[in-house]
């Protein structure tokens, strides 16, 4: 055992896992990158955490609603009851991020930190924000003091 907390990352799609044909194009496909691919692109995570990944959905969040959020909530509850998981991070699209966060905050009563995150620009963009958001969300999920605060949300400030 490394002594580092284990964080379980659930991918649901969205811009954070989107990819375009070039770094300068505005066109991209949501949800085409796996959660494991996102983690592989973020330097430094292994210094403070062990990461497990899974992909629950792979779509734009405009296609996610209460039915999918119930499935997500059940999975979060399962994971936070596991002795092998110290926190959960969910990547989600921004179109319905607020609704998903609110829904999960109301229905989940996690005993461990749960943090949602997203991105405004796809992973392949020149100014992609998903890596920094994912880093900070995973870091937050390692903080034991966040237990009992429900489902939290992390996104970085937009550049001006």
Name each model-derived stretch.
Residues 111, 117-129:
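Proline/glycine-rich low-complexity loops and linkers
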């Amino acid at each position: 055992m490394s002594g580092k907390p284990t964080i379980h990352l659930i991918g649901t799609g969205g811009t954070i896992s989107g990819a375009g044909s070039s770094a300068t194009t505005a066109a991209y496909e949501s949800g085409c990158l796996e959660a494991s691919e996102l983690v592989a692109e973020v330097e430094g995570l292994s210094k403070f955490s062990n990461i497990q990944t899974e992909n629950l959905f792979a779509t734009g969040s405009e296609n996610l609603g209460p039915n999918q959020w119930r499935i997500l909530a059940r999975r979060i509850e399962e994971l936070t009851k596991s002795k092998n998981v110290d926190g959960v991070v969910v990547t989600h699209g921004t179109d319905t991020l607020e609704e998903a966060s609110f829904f999960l905050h109301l229905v989940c009563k996690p005993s461990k930190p749960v943090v949602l995150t997203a991105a405004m620009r796809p992973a392949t963009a020149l100014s992609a924000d998903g890596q920094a958001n994912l880093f900070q969300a995973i870091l937050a999920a390692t903080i034991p003091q966040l237990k009992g605060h429900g489902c939290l949300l992390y996104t970085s400030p937009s550049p001006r």
